[in-house]
UniProtKB/Swiss-Prot annotation:
It is a multi-pass membrane protein. Heme b b562 binds at H83, H182. A ubiquinone binds at H201. Belongs to the cytochrome b family. This is Cytochrome b. The chain crosses the membrane at residues 33-53, 77-98, 113-133, 178-198, 226-246, 288-308, 320-340, 347-367. It holds the Pfam family Cytochrome_B. One of its GO terms (molecular function) is ubiquinol-cytochrome-c reductase activity. Heme 1 (or BL or b562) is low-potential and absorbs at about 562 nm, and heme 2 (or BH or b566) is high-potential and absorbs at about 566 nm. It comes from the Eukaryota. Its cofactor is heme b. Component of the ubiquinol-cytochrome c reductase complex (complex III or cytochrome b-c1 complex) that is part of the mitochondrial respiratory chain. The b-c1 complex mediates electron transfer from ubiquinol to cytochrome c. Contributes to the generation of a proton gradient across the mitochondrial membrane that is then used for ATP synthesis. It is found in: Mitochondrion inner membrane.
Length: 379
């Protein structure tokens, strides 16, 4: 008689994806982030669902409803801060997941990689709309500034902005539609994640060497299910540390002031995980140029597989590329810092240099380093 997990139509799919899945024996902890992202997504949907039960998407009561959740709902403060800081953990895992893909050449799985970039864009859109919902000062002005960027699109720009707003400014219609979209998008992300996994399991996982490991595989369970569990425990430890001791450390104090269209905050800035892109946007004086640079800062990930000129897939044995990779990582940290600073000297210059460097490293220096490394291989 066949084992149930191998015979049952539904369990069979789960079995092939998470239990008997042939996995390379040498994948490191950098491969944990996929499962951590799944856990973050589940947490966000669950906490978001409970928040939505008490939240009201109306400009007059939105701010009060969030206060009500924190003060009057049983463990409402915990749910709210798990959701807010869970988003930060989500983005930390996302960026590390993408960095792992860049370092070990996982972008050579084209379908998986491109769908991953689309997922990143969806998650960013969802997080942006979620930031608008508490209807504090930074929510309102952040929404105004970012949606206004659409007006840079030639000819249809101004009409498009009013269409997104549902009026002539960010108001009740905007808040209502953002809430509706913020609620539905995570479910679309879940569906896309399943397709992302489907594509990955067509080719099998990459590994730190970048070599084909078809001849040497081990089952996912119990080896990697246990390994993922340790990663999960660490993630929740840091998340709870954040939620229970420093719940507001990553937030903006301005968001504890109700939205006021007549009073502009001195420094309008998005959440910390968008600051690098915001810095790139601000570093270009031209509005349309800034918007294009902002889009390209993420979409550049889709170009990476086509400018991979190295004979080796992974960076494990490529010291020049490794130096450039870590320079890029440091550059992104600088951009994140600059995005949170006021627009004045010397921050403007630092932001412009860091933005130029960001694109130069990816588009010019990395392919160049690959060619030099190819030459060295022949010596």
């Amino acid at each position: 008689m066949k084992i149930t997990r191998k015979a049952h139509p539904l369990l069979k799919m789960i079995n092939h994806s998470f239990i008997d899945l042939p996995t390379p024996p040498n994948i490191s902890s950098w491969w944990n982030f996929g499962s951590l992202l799944g856990a973050c997504l589940a947490l966000q949907i669950l906490t978001g669902l409970f928040l939505a039960m008490h939240y009201t998407a109306d400009t007059t009561t939105a701010f009060s409803s969030v206060t009500h959740i924190c003060r009057d709902v049983n463990y409402g403060w915990l749910i709210r801060y798990l959701h807010a800081n869970g988003a930060s953990m989500f983005f930390i895992c996302l960026y590390l997941h993408v960095a792992r893909g860049m370092y070990y050449g996982s972008y050579m799985f084209l379908e998986t990689w491109n769908l991953g970039v689309i997922l990143l864009l969806f998650v960013m859109a969802t997080a942006f709309m979620g930031y608008v919902l508490p209807w504090g000062q930074m929510s309102f002005w952040g929404a105004t500034v970012i949606t206004n960027l659409l007006s840079a699109i030639p000819y249809i720009g101004p009409t498009l902005v009013e269409w997104v707003w549902g009026g002539f400014s960010v108001d009740k219609a905007t808040l209502t539609r953002f809430f509706a979209l913020h609620f539905i998008l995570p479910f679309i992300i879940t569906a896309l994640t399943m397709v992302h996994l489907l594509f990955l399991h067509e080719t099998g996982s990459n590994n730190p060497t970048g070599l084909n490991s078809d001849c040497d595989k081990i089952p996912f369970h119990p080896y990697y299910s246990m390994k993922d569990l340790i990663g999960l425990l660490l993630l929740f430890f840091f998340l709870l540390l954040l939620v229970l001791f420093f719940p507001d450390i990553l937030g903006d104090p301005d968001n504890y002031t109700p939205a006021n269209p007549l009073n502009t905050p001195p420094h309008i800035k998005p959440e910390w995980y968008f600051l690098f892109a915001y810095a790139i946007l601000r570093s270009i004086p031209n509005k349309l140029g800034g918007v294009l640079a902002l889009l390209l800062s993420i979409l550049i990930l889709m170009i990476i597989p086509f400018i991979h000129l190295s004979k080796q897939r992974s960076m494990s044995f490529r010291p020049l590329s490794q130096c450039l990779f870590w320079t890029l990582a440091a550059n992104l940290i600088i951009l994140t810092w600059i995005g949170g600073q006021p627009v004045e000297h010397p921050y403007i210059t630092i932001g412009q240099v860091a933005s130029i460097l960001y694109f130069t490293i990816i588009l010019i220096l990395m392919p160049l380093a690959s060619l030099i490394e190819n030459k060295i291989l022949k010596w």
